[in-house]
Amino acid sequence: MNDQNTPQVQQSTSTGGLLKRSVSRRSLFQAGGSLVALGSLAALAGCGSTNAGAPDAQASEQESGSTLRVGMEAAYAPYNWQATQESEYTIPIENVSGAYADGYDVQIAKRVAEALGAEPVAVKLSFDGLIDALASNQIDVIIAGMAPTEERRQSIDFSDPYFEGTYGLFVREGSPYQDATSLADLSGASVVGQKGTKLDEVIDEIPGVVHMTPLPSVPNVLAALQQGAADAATYNMENEAAYLKSNPGIVPVRFAEGEGFPDVVTAAVGVSKGNDEVLLAINSALANLSDAERQELWDGALERQPE
């Protein structure tokens, strides 16, 4: 994981109270539950001098502590996965009885929810259904290891990145492609990635590739590779150790410097379009996370993720 290049939010110094002030659901969730911040940032930052006994202040107190519905797969470790036991790291999965979500995304969700004065709950959905779920008000935000691609930006807005990394390729041990040192060496190989993600899109950067039909999840992708249905599979290199541990018989391709995928893996929080004040609050929360804190959260997720 490379947090050194993660952009920092310039406005964060003027909204330092965002992490300390509880925000009412009335001010954040309007128009059928979509994220719309009413009024000014002063309301979010707690800059006003409203009398504690005033009706508006009482309403705010009653509505604070509302839920932030966070869309994710809960099947994409170490970003997010489903757990059976509650812990300090988990949040409930709203649409799966007795289940919880854990992972790096969940730790980010906790901090975003704190900035918005809400309690986070996960909503488990297929990755390719997340944007539609946001548009139809099934969820309030997407925190699911989602890359802010130009295509997705046509439908939703994104925060600053909370994760950056690189893409790689796995092949089966003993494969003729195991000793490849450039993408060109994979010419003619059948390569598979996860549906609806950059892991599928970057495959087209391999000259002469046989681009296979994408599969719903990373476990499906790696299983296809192990079973010989594909010659290679794309993956996020920051997850390499965990994937190798739980998927025997696969090995990473070691590209020469500058000969691998040029794209950078990024993940950002997705929100409905037009919610600039909410994005500012989210970006402020992310800017308050140092590189060291992000690395600690990532390392913790790697240690806890299921095998």
Question: What are these language model-derived features?
Answer:
Residues 164-173, 241-286, 302-307:
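Periplasmic-binding protein-like
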Residues 47-57:
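Bacterial lipoprotein signal-peptidase II cleavage site
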Residues 64-145:
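Extracytoplasmic small-molecule ligand-binding "clamshell" domains
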Residues 1-23, 34-43:
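N-terminal secretory signal peptides
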Residues 49, 198-212, 252, 283-307:
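Ligand-binding clefts/hinges and TM-proximal coupling segments of bilobed small-molecule sensing domains
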Residues 119-185, 260:
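Acidic, polar ligand-binding/catalytic clefts
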Residues 145-155, 202-205, 231-263:
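A ligand-binding cleft/hinge motif common to bilobed small-molecule-binding domains
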Residues 25-29:
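N-terminal export leaders
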